[in-house]
Amino acid sequence: MIIEINETNIGDAAKVYMESWKDSHQDICSAEFIEKHDFDYMLNFLNEKIKQKYDIFIDFYNEIPVGIVGINPEDEEICLLYISPKEQGKGFGNELLEFALSKCKNPYITVLDTNKKAIDFYLKRGFVPAGNQPEPNKEKCIFERKYVYQNKNM
Protein backbone atom coordinates (compact mmCIF):
# COMPACT_ATOMS: atom_id res chain seq x y z
CA MET A 1 0.00 0.00 0.00
CA ILE A 2 1.53 3.30 -1.10
CA ILE A 3 0.62 6.34 0.98
CA GLU A 4 1.96 9.85 1.45
CA ILE A 5 4.37 10.13 4.34
CA ASN A 6 3.04 11.88 7.41
CA GLU A 7 3.92 12.42 11.07
CA THR A 8 3.08 8.85 12.01
CA ASN A 9 5.13 7.10 9.30
CA ILE A 10 7.99 9.52 8.56
CA GLY A 11 10.20 7.58 10.99
CA ASP A 12 9.58 4.42 8.96
CA ALA A 13 10.44 6.33 5.79
CA ALA A 14 13.66 7.70 7.31
CA LYS A 15 14.72 4.19 8.38
CA VAL A 16 14.13 2.73 4.90
CA TYR A 17 15.92 5.71 3.35
CA MET A 18 18.91 5.40 5.69
CA GLU A 19 19.35 1.64 5.25
CA SER A 20 18.97 1.74 1.48
CA TRP A 21 21.08 4.87 0.97
CA LYS A 22 23.94 3.42 3.03
CA ASP A 23 23.71 0.13 1.13
CA SER A 24 23.74 1.80 -2.29
CA HIS A 25 26.54 4.26 -1.46
CA GLN A 26 28.91 2.05 0.54
CA ASP A 27 31.23 1.43 -2.41
CA ILE A 28 31.27 5.00 -3.71
CA CYS A 29 31.49 7.23 -0.63
CA SER A 30 33.92 7.43 2.27
CA ALA A 31 33.03 5.69 5.53
CA GLU A 32 32.96 9.09 7.26
CA PHE A 33 30.49 10.46 4.74
CA ILE A 34 28.24 7.41 5.08
CA GLU A 35 28.38 7.58 8.88
CA LYS A 36 27.00 11.14 8.76
CA HIS A 37 23.84 9.83 7.10
CA ASP A 38 22.27 8.40 10.23
CA PHE A 39 18.58 8.20 11.11
CA ASP A 40 18.35 11.80 12.35
CA TYR A 41 20.09 13.13 9.24
CA MET A 42 17.67 11.28 6.95
CA LEU A 43 14.65 12.31 9.03
CA ASN A 44 15.71 15.96 8.83
CA PHE A 45 16.35 15.61 5.09
CA LEU A 46 12.85 14.20 4.49
CA ASN A 47 11.29 16.94 6.62
CA GLU A 48 13.19 19.54 4.61
CA LYS A 49 11.92 18.07 1.33
CA ILE A 50 8.36 18.16 2.68
CA LYS A 51 8.83 21.85 3.58
CA GLN A 52 10.00 22.38 -0.01
CA LYS A 53 6.65 20.90 -1.14
CA TYR A 54 7.99 17.59 -2.43
CA ASP A 55 5.44 14.78 -2.52
CA ILE A 56 6.99 11.81 -0.70
CA PHE A 57 5.39 8.40 -0.45
CA ILE A 58 6.09 5.22 1.48
CA ASP A 59 5.18 1.68 0.43
CA PHE A 60 4.03 -0.82 3.04
CA TYR A 61 3.74 -4.55 2.42
CA ASN A 62 2.02 -6.54 5.17
CA GLU A 63 2.39 -3.45 7.38
CA ILE A 64 6.19 -3.47 6.86
CA PRO A 65 7.77 -0.36 5.28
CA VAL A 66 9.58 -1.52 2.13
CA GLY A 67 10.36 1.60 0.10
CA ILE A 68 9.98 5.31 -0.53
CA VAL A 69 9.75 7.60 -3.54
CA GLY A 70 9.56 11.36 -3.93
CA ILE A 71 8.37 13.72 -6.63
CA ASN A 72 9.30 17.37 -7.00
CA PRO A 73 6.03 18.78 -8.37
CA GLU A 74 7.77 21.90 -9.73
CA ASP A 75 9.82 20.05 -12.34
CA GLU A 76 8.53 16.44 -12.07
CA GLU A 77 11.83 14.99 -10.92
CA ILE A 78 11.29 11.53 -9.48
CA CYS A 79 13.69 11.24 -6.57
CA LEU A 80 14.35 9.35 -3.39
CA LEU A 81 13.44 5.96 -4.86
CA TYR A 82 14.88 3.69 -2.20
CA ILE A 83 13.94 0.12 -1.35
CA SER A 84 14.94 -1.57 1.90
CA PRO A 85 17.95 -3.80 1.07
CA LYS A 86 16.22 -6.94 2.34
CA GLU A 87 13.17 -6.18 0.16
CA GLN A 88 14.99 -5.50 -3.12
CA GLY A 89 14.26 -7.73 -6.08
CA LYS A 90 10.63 -8.28 -5.04
CA GLY A 91 8.96 -5.75 -7.35
CA PHE A 92 8.60 -2.88 -4.89
CA GLY A 93 10.90 -0.62 -6.91
CA ASN A 94 8.77 -1.20 -10.01
CA GLU A 95 5.61 -0.54 -8.02
CA LEU A 96 6.90 2.76 -6.62
CA LEU A 97 8.32 3.88 -9.96
CA GLU A 98 5.06 3.13 -11.78
CA PHE A 99 3.19 5.00 -9.04
CA ALA A 100 5.46 8.05 -9.43
CA LEU A 101 5.29 7.93 -13.23
CA SER A 102 1.49 7.97 -13.07
CA LYS A 103 1.70 11.35 -11.32
CA CYS A 104 4.02 13.01 -13.86
CA LYS A 105 3.73 14.14 -17.49
CA ASN A 106 7.45 14.68 -18.21
CA PRO A 107 9.37 12.88 -15.47
CA TYR A 108 13.10 12.64 -15.10
CA ILE A 109 15.56 11.27 -12.57
CA THR A 110 19.18 11.90 -11.65
CA VAL A 111 21.50 9.02 -10.77
CA LEU A 112 25.12 8.89 -9.70
CA ASP A 113 27.21 7.68 -12.63
CA THR A 114 28.75 5.09 -10.30
CA ASN A 115 25.40 3.59 -9.24
CA LYS A 116 25.29 0.92 -11.95
CA LYS A 117 22.48 -1.05 -10.29
CA ALA A 118 20.16 1.98 -10.34
CA ILE A 119 21.20 2.94 -13.88
CA ASP A 120 20.37 -0.56 -15.15
CA PHE A 121 17.03 -0.43 -13.32
CA TYR A 122 16.04 2.87 -14.97
CA LEU A 123 17.34 2.03 -18.45
CA LYS A 124 15.22 -1.15 -18.47
CA ARG A 125 12.19 0.94 -17.61
CA GLY A 126 12.34 3.49 -20.41
CA PHE A 127 14.70 6.18 -19.13
CA VAL A 128 17.49 7.49 -21.38
CA PRO A 129 20.52 9.67 -20.54
CA ALA A 130 20.09 13.41 -21.01
CA GLY A 131 23.34 14.97 -19.72
CA ASN A 132 25.73 15.41 -16.79
CA GLN A 133 25.67 17.70 -13.78
CA PRO A 134 28.33 18.01 -11.08
CA GLU A 135 27.48 16.22 -7.84
CA PRO A 136 27.43 18.68 -4.91
CA ASN A 137 29.51 16.26 -2.79
CA LYS A 138 33.00 17.78 -2.70
CA GLU A 139 34.54 14.78 -0.87
CA LYS A 140 34.84 12.88 -4.12
CA CYS A 141 34.62 13.80 -7.76
CA ILE A 142 31.25 12.15 -8.38
CA PHE A 143 28.85 13.02 -11.15
CA GLU A 144 25.13 12.60 -11.53
CA ARG A 145 23.50 12.06 -14.87
CA LYS A 146 20.00 13.16 -15.75
CA TYR A 147 17.72 10.55 -17.35
CA VAL A 148 14.43 11.39 -19.01
CA TYR A 149 11.52 9.02 -19.39
CA GLN A 150 10.73 8.14 -22.99
CA ASN A 151 8.98 4.79 -22.85
CA LYS A 152 5.36 5.13 -21.81
CA ASN A 153 4.90 1.32 -21.91
CA MET A 154 6.84 -0.20 -19.01
Give, region by region, the residue ranges found by the protein language model.
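Conserved acetyl-CoA-binding loop-helix of GNAT-fold acetyltransferases
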Residues: 83, 89-102, 120-124
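Loop/helix-junction capping segments adjacent to catalytic residues or to phosphate/diphosphate-binding pockets
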Residues: 11, 90, 116
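Short active-site oxyanion
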Residues: 55, 105-107
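Glycine-centered flexibility sites
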Residues: 67-70, 89-93, 126, 131
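Acetyl-CoA-dependent GNAT
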Residues: 4-10, 15-86, 97-99, 135, ...
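C-terminal "cap" of GNAT-fold acetyltransferases
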Residues: 5, 108, 112-119, 124-125, ...
